[in-house]
């Protein structure tokens, strides 16, 4: 069978261009070759061939599209020709010449000529002549090429029901064939056949699934590839690139319908903010406080005095219990306030704000160590006000966030590279104005009682609208509101609310609310949220936020006014609105401000101004829309509503609302204007005889009242039978359909993509073959969909009512989809079997992006509401988006529910729908809806099931176009439904026993049936077939086959008293068999499938079932397939699931390891004493032995038992295994203690080992060089062994180890250079901090490699796409630049210029999580099953599974097919009594020494009012309870405990260790902050050997001493013995052989005296560290470690209360005793004394003006401190009246301090306030502050300048004052950095800086100082005096004696003034005068001398 198209020519083309044709049939497309430079005629002369597996339907369509081809841009569509293949099917050969149509369905001149041929399989169609085509050489070439195809693509198969063979443009003109004359009794109008988008009949689908697919070529220059008839896709040479586009898994049978509203339900949230420090605060000599606000809650840090860079490190926690929407809109505000105290509120320096949602959307829901930029909201021209470094995290219930490790944190001084901004936000944000323009509103509801209004009307005759509206806008923590419009349902404002904020803003949403002004309390009428991300685009070609002018629809509570509205929350925007409230016309614009403009208002206060009014037509031309609905079924009506008549009302906006839509605006129907383009486009859709005059067509919006009939004890139904009521509503809305059409196209693409991705996931989950092919098909469909969007979306470009957002958004969507299509195409080629999961993740990103783009921010037509009403009260509703119902003649634009029968489940409004009330179905409707323009009305019945007659409201001439008020079905089909209910698993526990008595109730149409009740199980196997006979369904048979009604299955718990409890619900669609179909594979019989059961929004188990709907033909039930039940069972009237559907069974053996029971709680107040465990699976089971005295020994005597059972061969269908624990009481009674259901046996199935695998091989050699000290960048060394490798592992001591040993012996100079630590100085903390450094380095490397990999993938997927990658490249370049800066930081960045070489220190492993998560819960052979009792709690109860746990069963399972492979039972030492559990240890009681090391806690939840806690450790194990109350740590949220505790315990009685952190309180009981529980028994018995961690190196002394009482060689010997492994065999030269693996390593060890001795321990340790490579028994051994465990509080389940770092060692008491515990007590800070001598100052700015002379001078003194101004501030004396800025002091400060070198922090203890009970320890950075001041006698001293020196890294001082420049402090020049802790003594000149009026640094002086650091001991030996005192006094400075007052010593002053100030001037004048005098004397004497000379005298 094949369809062949010969495309000849296309003529009358316009212009000269390259042409290409695309021919599509059944979604499979071929492209022609490109014809270059065609002018008028394109002569294609090409043949295309489709092999078809199923016969062609006469209604199928062939589509030809002609494009102008472009290599660069997307191809431009010239025109389309669509042909219905009716004539081709009848005559086999058709010649066609016809014109094309354009996008708007208008005829164009261009025409094509072609020939179409078809041969059916049975040869029924005409004579066939092969020669015409098959002789064609080109085709044979193509046939040949197709053998080498690298891809196959079946596309989607759109189809139509259009009779007639002409192209679609002739729609309105042509009558259908076959005797239909267009009368309505046939159930279809003439035009009904024109509906596109109705899915093609699936009758042939199974045959077609394997049909060869055709690839749509990426390179259009090539010929399209064709595949020959009957060729199996997998036989193609490159089958790996095959694509599959039809669904493999039967997902369509599982409609996903969630009943309960999820939005609006409150949840627990915790916002934690750590304020670390602030930098570069603007202002002089500040006392800053940081205020942290979240919503309305405020908290403050302590005040730091006289500093511009305060250090706080304070932690704040805010707890909330609100709905997610409210939470994410809360604003986090961080402000810095200067001089705040009890009396003063302080002045704001700057603030920073962002919403909680922005933080939550970050990776791990947090910002870590980021700098917030402060700006002044009162002065937007002021610029930057400083930075605050903080951590911000938002945690919801159940969120697990990974917090980076707190210890040993270095200052990240790269501020610019670590700003508190989301990815993509530029660091320099600009100020912008946000103009929210409010124009007018319509359709407001009544908001006052009419009582007073009626009184007024009676007295005054005044009739007012009962609402006084105004609009309030909330944005970024500010709000503004318009004026109030008194008494108006249609208020007109024309005002704009103006916000000023930084752009882009860090607040995502703007809230616009219409409120009613009231004297007592204003209430919200409706709320709309504007998401700024949806109305802007931040890309290169993006646009600023813009909106409208456009109408937005507001929804909320019902419109009837009551004084106390229970649904008022809905009007506030919380939860889904249940009714239309109003619509508001608004606009939004953003203007970026030029802050340098002097006319700019600098405040950010909200302003309200007048806005320019806009015309009414700006939102689009008003059009009349027509909504039609037909109610085909109303069932499952809740019994509460069953006693009164029920009616259904449909509304759109206020139209159709007859009960409370009183304030509906009466809009006149707009006149048609002759020039309208739309009119021309759609002229074919309207007809002349349409009854369109206003008033001709009244709306009918509700069904006639009808009394429900009973279905069963829970539900009723309405007996519609063959008469189906209809509704229709006329309404007027602006015509903005284009927006909805574009959204629909994207929704269609997204739905198709989601369906495909779900299918791929299902294939992976169920392990179906070739998921990669299906993913390729999904990507191919996505690519085609994106290209289709580009061709369809760009219509109506010149539409006058298009807003700027419409235009920009369309461009943006087109760019995104074009890029997505190309990425999908290139991704398709990369999909391989091993990359499926990675590519699936990338596709999920596509889906998210599509969903985001499809959400249209500018509304047009309001949503449709369907209300069920009883007794004139609204009971329940459903809401359908209008875009889903919108009609279009283009298939892709059609709403997904338009002209389709949709199943709707009505729900209760608002909060009534939460919880158990929301679980009940209020009503189930089968409803047909259609929405379109009135002029398209002829189509409204086109999708209804056929076979009806219309009943009109009125009869008369010309009324045939009126819609019907009901439909009477004359055609009906009779069916039988078979529901094969096999089993369910993981159901909710509905009884107090923790079990249920479940039965299932199946609903179909108006019938329901129940399965039998199975008692006391959560995993019932009903194995029952329910048969529903004589089901009457209305409509055509084939329509029912394609889209059968939904089956509802509800699971209930049978109660002896009262009604059954609801446990969950699921939905299914049956597989339909028509009477003329054979009941045979592949479709029948149906396969059992799992259906997810939901209770509300929570999953409540799975149902394994199958459903089939069988048509009963003319000969009755005789034609139905027989019911073949299993012959071996007789269950009376209950019919089991038939053979063929029920699973195929095999014999399995289930071995059970019974180890013991733990922590059993009392049952009915009585203790459990003699428990027993019952195991049951598929009706078979086994009982454990009885524990005779649970208190004495809770373990079982008999360890292993087994039973045999028949289980399905398909592992996915395995039934659950039930574990029950009963307590055996006297007189044969027993009570259920608790139960556990193992829902999946998969992990317990035994699979024989693969003998060919690598670790079974015993030959080969691998060399591994092991370094005892792991360098920073080296990750864990693993030995990989392949099947042919020799098994020798060489562990060499690395060369640098030997070098290190050598260097130790060298002199001190080399040692200093190498920075080699002195081993005697090292302790456990050195090891800990070194390990954390390594961990951080590894994480950093991991992140960078992760980023690189991600970017590589991005680059791969965007191959050849230059545009989309640009941003990425830019940001990457910036990151690289930053990285370089960080690696070579300047001096200002506070890091040493030469990179510090890491000292070599032995390390341990720091796990940032629990040890259990790293080692699979230590369940390698012993599993823990939680036993549950009691009812499953509901979400709103806040109850968790934890509360239902009544104990734990320890044991294991092993499931395998019998008989067992012989080689297993023949293995050495096989003990049949233990079965598969060979080599397990004895479970007799054992005494153990448990040693707990608690290192530290981080981020504890504050427990006191002051926001701090006083934590201490409490440990409980069995009866031992240790409370370390005396050693509580005062006011600390990050305490370092450094404690170890030894407890002797006895397993199994004492095996659960609880480590808790309590808050110490002086009065009252101590509060629990949080606790963590550790199961020690699983650790103790685990093969991972978690008793004592294996260290990295073996040492017998020093800080890294070996802790385990067993040496490595002893451990190795024991492991070999237990695992029955050959070895260990120690050989010479450090060799050891273990099971054909040889390890080599160092063979000597150095003792405390430096003596070297031979040892085997090093090599034994290397074998232990590679134990996972030992064949058969190898596994990873737990290394020496510290684990980080979350602390949880039972009162706040699911939210971490902090983290605790600890580790646990266990030592059996029958082994050698361990050594003394390690000393991990917190390091004591070392005492130092810093001596600072201030010698001189120079160039100090002169501040004072002299009273008499106006001379500038300063009275200088220098102030310095180390810990804080209040703690140790010291001042020099005053150098008075310095006229030059020079000051001489010779003054010494002494600063004693305690210092922690590892953390680089000064430790100080002080009382927090005068009321504090004890001192609090603070850790602050070691920074010396020097300030220069001008002393004043009467007023306050003036601050002149300061410098802050970080004692660990500060610029070296200049040698002279001249060389000292400002750049030394600002880091602009490269100055060497020094550390006082290394240099000990430093002297030099340093600059002092202050900020000027322009907020820039300026030099205000220089200080010469000398810093000398001594330890406390050295300081004691060499004491010195403070200031200039003894001992070792400093000389008095030689100051100029100008400290005077004029009138005391005038001569001295004159002398100073003249001598000092005018010295050089006076000298010059004197010299000049002397010169003049000499000249005068010379001139005076000259004549006399000359005369004398002349006369010779």
From Swiss-Prot:
The chain crosses the membrane at residues 1960-1980. One of its GO terms (molecular function) is protein-containing complex binding. Ca(2+) 5 binds at residues 1832, 1835, 1838. Residues 127-212, 654-708, 1294-1318, 1339-1398 are annotated as: Disordered. Ca(2+) 3 binds at residues 1504, 1510, 1559, 1561. Residues 1981-1993 are extracellular. Ca(2+) 4 binds at residues 1504, 1559, 1561, 1567. SMART domains: C2 (SM00239), FerB (SM01201), FerI (SM01202). Belongs to the ferlin family. The N-terminal first 124 residues can be classified as C2 domain, based on their 3D-structure. They are not sufficient for calcium ion or phospholipid binding. This is Otoferlin.
């Amino acid at each position: 069978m094949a369809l062949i198209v010969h495309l000849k020519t296309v003529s009358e083309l316009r212009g000269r261009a390259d042409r290409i044709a695309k021919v599509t049939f059944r979604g499979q497309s071929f492209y022609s070759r490109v014809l270059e430079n065609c002018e008028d005629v394109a002569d294609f002369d090409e043949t295309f061939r489709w092999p078809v597996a199923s016969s062609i339907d006469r209604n199928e369509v062939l589509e030809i599209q002609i494009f102008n081809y472009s290599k660069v841009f997307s191809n431009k569509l010239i025109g389309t020709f669509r042909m219905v293949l009716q004539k081709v099917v009848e005559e086999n050969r058709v010649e066609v010449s016809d014109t094309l149509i354009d996008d708007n369905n208008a005829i164009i001149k261009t025409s094509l000529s072609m020939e179409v041929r078809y041969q059916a399989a049975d040869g029924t169609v005409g004579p066939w002549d092969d020669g015409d085509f098959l002789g064609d050489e080109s085709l044979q070439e193509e046939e040949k090429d197709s053998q080498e195809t690298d891809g196959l693509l079946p596309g989607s198969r759109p189809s139509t029901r259009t009779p007639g063979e002409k192209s679609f443009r002739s729609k309105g003109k042509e009558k259908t064939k076959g005797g239909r004359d267009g009368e309505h009794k046939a159930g279809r109008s003439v035009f009904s056949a024109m509906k596109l988008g109705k899915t093609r009949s699936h009758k042939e689908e199974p045959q077609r699934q394997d049909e060869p697919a055709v690839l749509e070529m990426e390179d259009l220059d090539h010929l399209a590839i064709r595949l020959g008839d009957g060729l199996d896709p997998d036989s193609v040479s490159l089958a790996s690139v095959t694509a599959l586009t039809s669904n493999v898994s039967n997902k369509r049978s599982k409609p996903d319908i969630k009943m309960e509203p999820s939005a609006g339900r409150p949840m627990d949230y915790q916002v934690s903010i750590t304020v670390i420090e602030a930098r570069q605060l603007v202002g002089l000599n500040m006392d800053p406080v940081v205020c942290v606000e979240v919503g309305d809650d405020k908290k403050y840090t302590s005040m730091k005095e006289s500093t511009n860079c305060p250090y706080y490190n304070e932690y704040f926690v805010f707890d909330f219990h609100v709905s997610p929407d409210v939470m994410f809109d809360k604003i986090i505000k961080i402000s810095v306030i200067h001089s705040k105290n009890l009396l003063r509120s302080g002045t704001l320096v700057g603030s920073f704000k962002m919403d909680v949602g922005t933080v939550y959307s970050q990776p791990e829901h947090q910002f870590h160590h980021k700098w917030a930029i402060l700006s002044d909201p009162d002065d937007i021209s002021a610029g930057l006000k400083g930075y605050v470094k903080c951590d911000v995290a938002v945690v919801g219930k159940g969120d697990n966030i990974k917090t980076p490790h707190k210890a040993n944190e270095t200052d990240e001084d790269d501020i610019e590279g670590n700003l508190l901004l989301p990815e993509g936000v530029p660091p320099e944000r600009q100020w912008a104005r946000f103009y929210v323009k409010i124009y007018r509103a319509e359709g407001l509801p009544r908001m006052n009682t009419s009582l007073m209004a009626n009184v007024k009307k009676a007295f005054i005759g005044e009739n007012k609208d009962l609402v006084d509206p105004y609009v309030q806008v909330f944005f970024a923590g500010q709000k503004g509101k318009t004026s109030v419009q008194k008494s108006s349902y249609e208020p007109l404002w024309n005002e704009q609310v103006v916000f000023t904020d930084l752009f882009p803003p860090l607040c995502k949403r703007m809230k616009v609310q219409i409120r009613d002004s009231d004297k007592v309390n204003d209430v919200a009428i409706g709320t709309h949220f504007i998401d700024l991300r949806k109305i802007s685009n931040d890309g290169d070609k993006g646009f600023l936020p813009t909106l409208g002018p456009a109408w937005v629809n507001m929804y909320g509570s019902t419109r009837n006014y009551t004084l106390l509205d229970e649904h008022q929350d809905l009007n506030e925007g919380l939860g889904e609105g249940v009714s239309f409230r109003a619509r508001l016309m608004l606009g939004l614009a953003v203007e970026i401000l030029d802050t340098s403009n002097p006319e700019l208002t600098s405040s950010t206060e909200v302003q309200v101004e007048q806005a320019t009014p806009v015309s009414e037509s700006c939102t689009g031309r008003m059009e009349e829309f027509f909504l039609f609905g037909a109610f085909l079924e109303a069932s499952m009506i809740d019994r509460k509503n069953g006693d009164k008549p029920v009616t259904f009302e449909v509304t759109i906006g206020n139209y159709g609302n007859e009960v409370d839509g009183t304030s509906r605006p009466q809009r006149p129907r707009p006149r048609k204007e002759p020039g309208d383009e739309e009119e021309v486009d759609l002229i074919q859709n309207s007809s002349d005889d349409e009854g369109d005059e206003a008033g001709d067509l009244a709306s009918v919006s509700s069904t006639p009242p009808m009394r429900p009939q009973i279905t069963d004890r829970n539900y009723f139904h309405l007996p519609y039978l063959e008469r189906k009521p209809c509704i229709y509503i006329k309404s007027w809305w602006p015509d903005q359909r284009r927006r909805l059409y574009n959204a629909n196209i994207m929704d269609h693409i997204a739905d198709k993509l989601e369906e495909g991705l779900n299918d791929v996931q299902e294939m992976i989950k169920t392990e179906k073959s070739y998921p990669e092919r299906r993913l390729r098909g999904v990507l191919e469909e996505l690519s085609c969909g994106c290209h289709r969007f580009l061709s369809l979306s760009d219509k109506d470009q010149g539409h006058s009512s298009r807003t700027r957002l419409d235009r920009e958004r369309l461009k943006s969507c087109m760019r995104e989809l074009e890029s997505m299509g190309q990425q999908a195409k290139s991704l398709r080629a990369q999909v391989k079997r091993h990359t499926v999961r990675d590519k699936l993740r990338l596709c999920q990103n596509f889906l998210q992006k599509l969903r985001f783009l499809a959400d249209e921010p500018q509304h047009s037509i309001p949503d449709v509401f369907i209300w069920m009403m009883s007794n004139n009260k609204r009971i329940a509703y459903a809401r359908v988006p209008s875009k889903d119902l919108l009609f279009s003649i283009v298939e892709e634009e059609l709403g997904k529910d338009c002209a389709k029968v949709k199943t709707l489940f009505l729900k209760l409004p608002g909060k009534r729908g939460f919880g158990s009330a929301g679980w009940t179905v209020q009503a189930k409707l089968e409803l047909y809806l259609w929405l379109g323009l009135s002029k398209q009305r002829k189509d409204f019945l086109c999708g209804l099931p056929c076979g009806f007659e219309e009943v009109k409201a009125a009869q008369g001439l010309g009324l045939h176009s009126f819609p019907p008020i009901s439909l009477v079905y004359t055609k009906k089909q009779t069916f039988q439904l078979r529901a094969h209910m096999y089993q369910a698993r993981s159901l909710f526990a509905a009884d107090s026993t923790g079990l249920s008595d479940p039965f299932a109730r199946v609903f179909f149409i108006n019938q329901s049936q129940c399965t039998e009740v199975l008692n006391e199980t959560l995993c019932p196997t009903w194995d029952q077939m329910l048969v529903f006979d004589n089901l009457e369904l209305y409509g055509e048979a084939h329509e029912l086959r394609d889209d059968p009604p939904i089956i509802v299955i509800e699971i209930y718990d049978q109660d002896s008293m009262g009604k059954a409890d609801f446990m969950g619900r699921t939905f299914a669609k049956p597989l339909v068999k028509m009477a003329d179909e054979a009941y045979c594979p592949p479709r029948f019989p149906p396969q059992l499938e799992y259906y997810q059961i939901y209770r509300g929004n929570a999953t409540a188990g799975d149902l394994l079932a199958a459903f089939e709907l069988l048509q009963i033909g003319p000969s009755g039930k005789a034609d139905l397939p027989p019911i073949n039940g299993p012959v071996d069972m007789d269950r009376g009237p209950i019919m089991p699931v038939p053979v063929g559907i029920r699973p195929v069974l095999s014999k399995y053996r289930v071995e059970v390891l019974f180890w013991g029971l733990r922590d059993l709680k009392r049952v009915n107040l009585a203790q459990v004493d003699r428990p027993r465990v019952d195991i049951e699976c598929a009706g078979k089971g086994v009982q454990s032995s009885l524990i005779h005295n649970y208190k004495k020994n809770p373990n079982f005597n008999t360890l292993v038992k087994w039973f045999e059972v028949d289980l399905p061969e398909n592992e996915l269908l395995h039934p659950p295994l039930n574990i029950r624990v009963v307590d055996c009481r006297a007189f044969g009674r027993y009570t259920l203690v608790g139960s556990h259901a193992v829902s999946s046996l998969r992990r317990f199935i035994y699979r024989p080992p693969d003998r060919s695998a690598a670790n079974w091989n015993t030959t080969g050699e691998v060399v591994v060089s092991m370094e005892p000290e792991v360098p920073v960048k080296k990750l864990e060394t693993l030995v990989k062994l392949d099947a042919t490798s020799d098994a020798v592992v060489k562990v060499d001591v690395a060369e640098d180890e030997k070098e290190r040993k050598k260097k130790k012996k060298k002199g001190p100079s080399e040692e200093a250079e190498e920075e080699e630590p002195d081993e005697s100085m090292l302790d456990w903390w050195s090891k800990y901090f070194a390990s954390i450094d390594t961990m951080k380095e590894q994480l950093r490397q991991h992140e960078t490699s992760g980023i690189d990999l991600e970017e590589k993938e991005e680059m791969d997927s965007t191959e050849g796409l230059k545009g989309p990658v640009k941003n990425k490249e830019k940001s990457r370049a910036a990151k690289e630049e930053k990285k370089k800066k960080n690696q070579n930081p300047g001096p200002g960045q506070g890091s040493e210029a030469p990179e510090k070489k890491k000292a070599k220190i032995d390390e341990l492993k720091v796990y940032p999580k629990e040890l259990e998560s790293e080692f699979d819960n230590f369940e390698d052979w012993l599993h823990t099953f939680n036993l549950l009792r009691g009812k499953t709690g509901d979400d709103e109860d806040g109850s968790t599974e934890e509360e239902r746990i009544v104990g734990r069963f320890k044991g294991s399972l092993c499931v395998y097919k019998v008989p067992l492979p012989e080689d297993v039972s023949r293995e050495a030492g096989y003990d049949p009594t233990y079965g598969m559990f060979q080599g397990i240890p004895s479970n007799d009681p054992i005494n153990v020494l448990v040693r707990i090391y608690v290192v530290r806690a981080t981020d504890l939840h504050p427990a006191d009012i002051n926001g701090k806690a006083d934590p201490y450790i409490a440990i409980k194990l069995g009866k031992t309870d240790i409370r370390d109350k005396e050693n509580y740590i005062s006011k600390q949220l990050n305490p370092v405990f450094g404690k170890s505790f030894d407890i002797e315990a006895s397993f199994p009685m004492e095996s659960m260790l609880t480590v808790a952190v309590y808050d110490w309180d002086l009065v009252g009981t101590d509060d629990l902050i949080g606790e963590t529980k550790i199961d020690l028994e699983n650790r103790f018995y685990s093969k991972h050997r978690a008793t004592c961690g294996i260290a990295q190196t073996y040492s017998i002394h020093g800080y890294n001493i070996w802790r385990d009482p067993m040496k490595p060689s002893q451990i190795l010997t024991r492991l070999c013995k237990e695992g029955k492994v050959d070895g260990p065999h120690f050989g010479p030269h450090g060799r050891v052989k273990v099971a054909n693996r040889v390890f080599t390593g160092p063979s000597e060890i150095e003792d405390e005296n430096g003596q070297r001795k031979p040892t085997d321990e090093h090599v034994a340790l290397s074998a232990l560290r590679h134990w996972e490579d030992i064949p058969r028994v190898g596994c990873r051994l737990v290394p020496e470690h510290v684990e980080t465990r979350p602390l949880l509080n039972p009162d706040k389940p699911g939210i971490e209360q902090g983290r605790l770092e600890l580790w646990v060692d266990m030592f059996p008491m029958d082994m050698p005793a361990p050594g003394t515990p390690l000393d991990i007590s917190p390091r004591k800070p070392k005492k130092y004394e810093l001596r600072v001598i201030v010698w001189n100052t120079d160039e100090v700015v002169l501040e004072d003006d002299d009273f008499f002379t106006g001379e500038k001078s300063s009275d200088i003194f220098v102030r310095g401190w180390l810990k804080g101004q209040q703690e140790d501030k010291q001042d020099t004396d005053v150098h008075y009246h310095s006229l030059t800025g020079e000051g001489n002091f010779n003054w010494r400060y002494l600063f004693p301090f305690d210092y922690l070198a590892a953390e680089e922090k000064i430790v100080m203890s002080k009382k927090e306030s005068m009321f504090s009970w004890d001192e609090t320890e603070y850790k602050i950075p070691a920074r010396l502050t020097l300030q220069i001041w001008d002393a004043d006698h009467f007023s306050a001293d003036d601050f002149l300048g300061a410098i802050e020196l970080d004692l660990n890294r500060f610029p070296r001082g200049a040698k002279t004052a001249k060389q000292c420049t400002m750049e030394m402090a600002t880091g602009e020049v490269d100055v060497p950095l020094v550390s006082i802790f290394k240099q000990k003594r430093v002297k030099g000149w340093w600059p002092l800086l202050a900020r000027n009026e322009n907020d820039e640094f300026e030099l205000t002086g220089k200080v010469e100082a000398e810093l000398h650091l001594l330890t406390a001991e050295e300081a004691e030996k060499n004491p010195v005096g403070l200031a200039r005192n003894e001992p070792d006094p400093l000389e008095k400075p030689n100051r100029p004696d100008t400290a005077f007052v004029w009138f005391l010593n005038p001569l001295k002053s004159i002398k100073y003034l003249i001598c000092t100030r005018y010295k050089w001037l006076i000298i010059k004048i004197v010299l000049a005068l002397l010169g003049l005098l000499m000249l005068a004397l010379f001139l005076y004497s000259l004549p006399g001398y000359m005369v004398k000379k002349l006369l010779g005298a």
